[in-house]
Regions:
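Hydrophobic scaffolds flanking metal-cofactor catalytic centers in soluble metalloenzymes
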Residues: 1-183, 197-211
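Residue-level detector of conserved catalytic or cofactor/ligand-binding positions
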Residues: 212-220
Length: 220
């Protein structure tokens, strides 16, 4: 999701790498699930997120899309996101005790919260959001430990590649709207269906490693 932000307004003003320490440790979020409520369609999922959910829940992507996930247009491209459910607008994976039922394989956005990503120059750095988490007694922890992600450098490159791949597509789709000779709606739908089919719906290899190759994913 493309956002124009002022880091001075939403963060502590610093940019972090995964080797830095930041006040992210919420001590297990004991008694709190605020960040799992009222998120609308903002928890957009990348292909690895969906692969992990599908594999660990033993459900096809199409099955997930009829339950805890949904599709929405994000800057001109149709992408999946976590669905908020029930009257309290809670994440579909939140149980009645306010605990995450997919915590071990939760999506990347959930995994890094209350951190965000600041993208530039085909890469990104982390920033600490200061208004999003109600916990005031957070402890400092090394970011790579907080992320708890295997092969972190490879994963971070994948995240950057995926972000800028989508950004380039989204800019192309948005520019079509200003071309009176182009079938912008039809082209946007075709691009969206290609992204969904190629990167989300078509099964990856059993180890999912082909997900790190955004331009030429290996299929089985």
């Amino acid at each position: 999701m493309l956002r124009e932000i002022n880091l001075d307004e939403i963060s502590d003003g610093r940019l972090y790498s995964s080797n830095d320490m930041a006040k992210t440790d919420c001590k297990g979020c004991d008694g709190c699930s605020a960040c799992c409520h009222g998120m609308g369609n903002s928890i957009v999922l990348d292909p690895l997120d969906v692969y992990r959910l599908s594999t660990n829940l033993s459900k096809s992507v199409n099955e997930l899309l009829t339950g805890p996930l949904e599709l929405n247009v994000v800057d001109g491209i149709i992408l999946p996101n976590l669905k908020m459910a029930r009257a309290e607008e809670a994440c579909s994976f939140l149980d009645t005790n306010g605990r995450c039922t997919v915590h071990a394989f939760r999506p990347g956005i959930c995994r890094m919260f209350p951190l965000g990503r600041f993208y530039e120059n085909r890469s990104f750095q982390y920033f600490l959001q200061i208004h999003e988490c109600p916990k005031t007694d957070r402890s400092k922890v090394k970011i790579k430990k907080w992320l708890d992600t295997p092969n972190l450098k490879t994963y971070e490159k994948y995240i950057a590649d995926w972000h800028f791949f989508l950004k380039d597509l989204q800019e192309y789709v948005m520019n079509l709207a200003f071309d009176s000779s182009a079938n912008s709606d039809g082209t946007a739908r075709t691009i969206s269906m290609h992204v969904l089919t190629q990167f989300y719906l078509t099964p990856y290899g059993e180890d999912g490693l082909s997900l790190i190759h955004i331009s030429e994913p290996t299929r089985r």
